[in-house]
A protein has these predicted regions:
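A conserved FAD-binding loop/helix module that cradles the flavin
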Residues: 296-299, 445-471
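Feature captures the FAD/FMN-dependent oxidoreductase FAD-binding
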Residues: 78, 140, 145-149, 197-246, ...
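Glycine-rich dinucleotide-binding loop and its adjacent helix/turn
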Residues: 123-140, 198-218, 241-306, 421-435
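Extreme N-terminal leader/targeting segments of oxidoreductases
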Residues: 3-43, 91, 110-144, 253-264, ...
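Local cysteine-cluster metal-coordination motifs and their immediate loop/turn environment
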Residues: 44-66, 88-110
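Beta1-alpha1 glycine-rich phosphate/pyrophosphate-binding loop at the start
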Residues: 5-32, 61-73, 78-87, 109, ...
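FAD-site-proximal beta/loop scaffold in flavoenzymes
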Residues: 253-284, 364, 376-449
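Long hydrophobic segments that form regular secondary structure
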Residues: 280-320, 358, 382-398, 405-406, ...
Length: 472
């Protein structure tokens, strides 16, 4: 620790966002950054704790105090080396991770935490700017062939580590571009897709083979996959969306899954044309986002940029507190209210509302009936009841269902492979190995829908088990 009084003398400083009036006019990244000296000053606030709980809270186990100290000393190459020992893609997590590390920072007990996520992003961007990032081409090949199905963060992590181990890795992606959730599920205003392209270009130079527009079971059979490869990793995500199937009016035109909406917009930003007959667009629409999570927030920001007339986001749960509750102490993740850059751009947020029915006219959505709910805890279980007389009509002609995901899609590849599922419908695994010989699983497909950083960790761990398997 170069400055033992840094956390006392220096206040936390963030890069902040571009002005609202500017950023809602495009899909460029909304976050700004600090200059190099400010980054060094922020790194000096890291206290060299006896027990660094930031490291404990980070899903990939990032050695945060070590690389923060390197930043403080201006050793960007050293900081990048430390950072990438545990994280394959700090340029992704440095932009979109909710930073559980900062919530568990020791300084956060009584003050603002050390700046970690933004400094992480600064480290990797400095590394690219200073030409410190080069293709790490394996010095030998083992002769083993690995197939990875899915090119999201888990699949890319698997491919990275197994390629570096000398295996020949082929990644199959059903969409026309590589990246999975990173590419199609996260708006450009949070993650510019050029950042993904930059990493994929490195992978290609390192020898990873990518097969976009290739759906296993259609363009290549499961049997061919099993015959041609020594091991297969299923990294297909958890893409079965939670629906409101039993809600009256669900069939009306104008009700869409959030991911369909976001995926289309990401394609439009890339320059693809969406046929008018299937194009989901919020221009001049009263938009209602059902679901209060990050994906819902992304729908809010996207709708605002598409010039929606109004945007409302509702959540069935109660409004979180501004502060930690007694049963939610540090260093655990705080169950407090979170406000995203999209929320700051102009939307109405409401809580404790359940969707009763969708109201239409001539087959098209016109409004949504909601009702207030009350949550109580009984025998440790939260239960909900509707409050009579609190019914309300919200005008809406475009609804985004952002209710999370149930599991990976079973129909098709997974069912044909005859993998086992757990009680939640995720692919059942023992040390990432499925019940099917030489078939492994990583990421959301086995864990359930979660954070990108968890998918990265899962992919890295799965890669180690796969390496052990093929080298027996």
């Amino acid at each position: 620790m170069g400055n033992p009084k840094g956390f006392i003398e220096i206040e936390k400083k963030l890069g902040g966002y571009r002005p609202v009036s500017e950023r809602i006019g495009d899909f460029g990244e909304v976050e700004q950054t600090l200059d190099e000296q400010d980054r060094i000053s922020q790194a000096s606030r890291c206290m060299d704790c006896g027990v660094p709980f930031c490291h404990w809270a980070c899903p990939v186990g990032s050695n945060i105090p070590e690389w923060q100290d390197a930043v403080y000393r201006g050793k960007w190459d050293e900081a990048y080396s430390i950072l990438t020992k545990t994280n394959s893609f700090p340029e992704f997590t440095g932009r979109i991770c909710p930073a559980p590390c900062e919530k568990s920072c020791v300084l956060a007990i009584h003050d603002e935490s050390v700046t970690i996520r933004e400094n992480e992003c600064a480290v990797v961007e400095h590394a690219f700017d200073l030409n410190l990032v080069h293709p790490n081409i394996p010095k030998f090949r083992t002769g083993k062939k690995i197939a990875v199905v899915g090119s999201g963060p888990a699949g890319l992590s698997v491919a990275d580590l197994l390629n570096q181990a000398g295996h020949t890795v082929t990644v199959f992606e059903q969409d026309n571009e590589v990246g999975g959730l990173l590419r199609y599920g996260i708006p450009d205003f949070k993650l510019n897709k050029g950042i993904i392209d930059r990493r994929i270009e490195l992978f290609v130079k390192e020898g990873v083979l990518f097969k976009p527009n290739t759906k296993v079971g259609e363009h290549i059979s499961e049997q061919q996959l099993m015959d041609d490869f020594d091991a297969v990793c299923l990294a297909c995500g958890a893409m079965e969306p939670r629906d409101l199937k039993s809600t009256p009016g669900r069939e009306l035109k104008g009700i869409h899954f959030a991911m369909d909406f976001l995926k289309q917009q990401n394609k439009v930003v890339k320059g693809e044309r969406i046929p008018e007959s299937i194009h989901i667009h919020a221009k001049n629409k009263k938009v209602l986002v059902i679901g209060g999570g990050d994906t819902g927030s992304d729908c809010v920001g996207t709708s605002i940029r598409q010039r929606a007339t109004s945007v409302t986001q509702i959540e069935i749960l109660d409004k979180p507190s501004d502060q930690r509750m007694e049963d939610n102490p540090w260093p655990f993740w705080p169950n407090t209210i979170r406000t995203s850059s999209s929320h700051l751009e102009g939307c109405e947020r409401r809580w404790s509302l359940n969707t009763r029915r969708f109201i239409g006219e001539n087959g098209s959505l016109k409004a949504v009936e909601v009702v207030k709910v009350e949550w109580t805890k009984t025998n440790g279980q939260m239960t909900m009841r509707e409050i009579p007389g609190t019914e309300e009509i919200i005008q809406a002609d475009l609804v985004m269902l952002s209710l999370g995901f149930l599991s990976p899609v079973h129909e098709g590849l997974l069912d044909r492979l005859k993998v086992d599922y757990d009680a939640r419908g995720n692919v059942k695994a023992n040390d990432f190995a499925t019940n099917v010989d030489k078939v492994f699983v990583a990421g959301d497909a086995t864990r359930g829908a979660s954070l990108v950083v968890h998918a990265i960790r899962s992919g890295r761990d799965a890669a180690l088990k796969m390496h052990e398997f093929v080298m027996r």
